[in-house]
């Protein structure tokens, strides 16, 4: 049983304290007389700093976006890099897997701390989210969240290693992230989210490539050669004083492969696509903010620009009805973003416009420097048909089918688009049956066109037009 008698006596401690106090009182006058006051103050200050030492840790905050709205690519590199640093001490992790991915993607949860060792020093990463709860704005009769929750990562380390971290470790993280991205590159398709005024992405899984692309072989080689020159000429663009970007105009009737060519370019270059719907952009300032949010090595796509918004020509006077629309986006604002000073805010970018009616576009949109290459996507010719037959029916170019000569004769002119030919080839897996069906369709279509030409005085079928401008 516990008893107070078992407690040690306090008498020795009291005696020692009394003796120590007596010695201090005796020494104090001697120290005050022999030690100068400035030295006394220095010793007291040093003792206080020792007892109340300031933290020796520095924390760098890496936000997902910079204040001007541009995406912080250092944040993306940090996310990729620390995702490879999973350890057994982690308490919470976020995992995901898209249907096109084989492996599970691991992301750190909010507040999770990850340690890393670099050249013998320890650094710590921490994922954070800054929630903006009261940042709603009234915008053109609708409510939007001006700034969604801001994500950031914190990098902490001892202050004495600041120079090593800034000049060596962070470039190391960026280079490692680039290697990782190249190894597991998953293309993204970005679209504009009006609710948050920012880009949101999904995985781009379009199978179109230049190998399977049904288009004129000469035109295909020209496009690929132009892309290759663009990628390797970074120093050239810098030397001549031009932004490192390239513009392509794809025009032609529906079903001629304009969208497939965009996907083939993205797969060829491993570039993400930013699908810009001009009708959802309210004003020029929003367009600039969106372009600042795009990354380098990407494609800015504007499909059907002739009917997206009223950008046909600046020479037409504006009527009262033109000013009643909700969009105040102007042609001059668009031109400034794709070719003005704002176009220099980024490197290795491609701008692609598609249209069905090239003649409706303002000439200012079409000049070199904005649209450097005009690619006419026309009706199906015999070379395009052979590519489609190889893709859909497995027919070889070296062993042509007996119906090829008749198809070559019937397909001349503006008869069918590649999409219409592909639809006919998909109706049957037997090459004989599929090609016989295509021959019937071609004969019927030619009769319709010849009748139409006779009524309109066109004077027969026109030869397929191939326009290619550099």
Swiss-Prot record:
Example of a GO MF term: ATP binding
Keywords tagged on the record: ATP-binding, Hydrolase, Magnesium, Nucleotide-binding, Signal
Family to which the UniProt record says this protein belongs: Belongs to the AAA ATPase family. BCS1 subfamily.
Signal peptide: 1-18
Binding site for ATP: 252-259
Cofactor: Mg(2+)
Full protein name: AAA-ATPase At5g17730
Listed EC numbers: 3.6.1.-
Record bears the keyword Thylakoid: no
Reaction it catalyzes: ATP + H2O = ADP + phosphate + H(+)
UniProt GO BP: response to stress
UniProt key word 4Fe-4S: no
């Amino acid at each position: 049983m516990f008893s107070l008698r078992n407690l040690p006596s306090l008498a020795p401690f009291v005696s020692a304290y009394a003796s120590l106090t007596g010695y201090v009182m005796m020494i104090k006058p001697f120290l005050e007389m022999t030690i100068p006051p400035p030295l006394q103050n220095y010793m007291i200050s040093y003792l206080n700093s020792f007892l109340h030492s300031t933290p020796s840790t520095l924390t760098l905050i890496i936000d997902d976006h910079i204040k001007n709205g541009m995406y912080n690519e250092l944040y993306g590199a940090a996310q990729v890099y620390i995702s490879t640093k999973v350890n057994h001490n982690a308490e919470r992790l976020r995992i995901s897997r898209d249907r096109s991915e084989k492996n599970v993607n691991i992301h750190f949860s909010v507040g999770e701390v990850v340690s890393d060792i670099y050249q013998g020093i320890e650094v710590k990463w921490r994922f954070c989210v800054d929630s903006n709860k009261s940042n709603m704005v009234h915008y053109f009769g609708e409510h939007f969240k001006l700034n969604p929750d801001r994500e950031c990562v914190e990098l902490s380390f001892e202050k004495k290693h600041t120079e090593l971290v800034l000049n060596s470790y962070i470039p190391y993280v960026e280079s490692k992230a680039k290697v990782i991205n190249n190894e597991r590159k998953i293309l993204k398709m970005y679209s504009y989210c009006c609710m948050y005024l920012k880009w949101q992405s999904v995985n781009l899984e379009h199978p179109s490539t230049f190998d399977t692309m049904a288009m004129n072989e000469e035109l295909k080689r020209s496009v690929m050669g132009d892309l290759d020159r663009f990628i390797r000429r970074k120093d050239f663009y810098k030397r001549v004083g031009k932004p490192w970007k390239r513009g392509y105009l794809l025009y032609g009737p529906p079903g001629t492969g304009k969208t497939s060519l965009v996907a083939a370019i993205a797969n060829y270059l491993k570039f993400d696509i930013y699908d810009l719907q001009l009708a959802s952009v309210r004003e020029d300032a929003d367009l600039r903010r969106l372009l600042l949010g795009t990354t380098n090595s990407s494609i800015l796509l504007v499909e059907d620009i002739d009917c997206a918004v009223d950008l046909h020509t600046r020479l037409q006077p504006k009527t009262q009805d033109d000013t009643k629309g909700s969009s105040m986006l102007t042609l001059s604002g668009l031109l400034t973003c794709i070719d003005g000073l704002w176009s220099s805010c980024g490197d290795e970018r491609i701008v692609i416009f598609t249209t069905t009616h090239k003649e409706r576009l303002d000439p200012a949109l079409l000049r070199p420097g904005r649209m450097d290459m005009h690619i006419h996507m026309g009706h199906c010719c015999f070379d395009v048909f052979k590519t489609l037959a190889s893709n859909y029916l497995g027919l070889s170019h070296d062993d042509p089918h007996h119906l090829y000569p008749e198809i070559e004769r019937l397909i001349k002119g503006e008869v069918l688009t590649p999409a219409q030919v592909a639809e006919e080839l998909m109706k049957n897996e037997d090459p004989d049956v599929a090609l016989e069906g295509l021959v019937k369709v071609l004969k019927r279509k030619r009769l319709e066109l010849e009748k139409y030409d006779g009524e309109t005085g066109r004077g027969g079928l026109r030869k397929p037009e191939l326009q290619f401008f550099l």
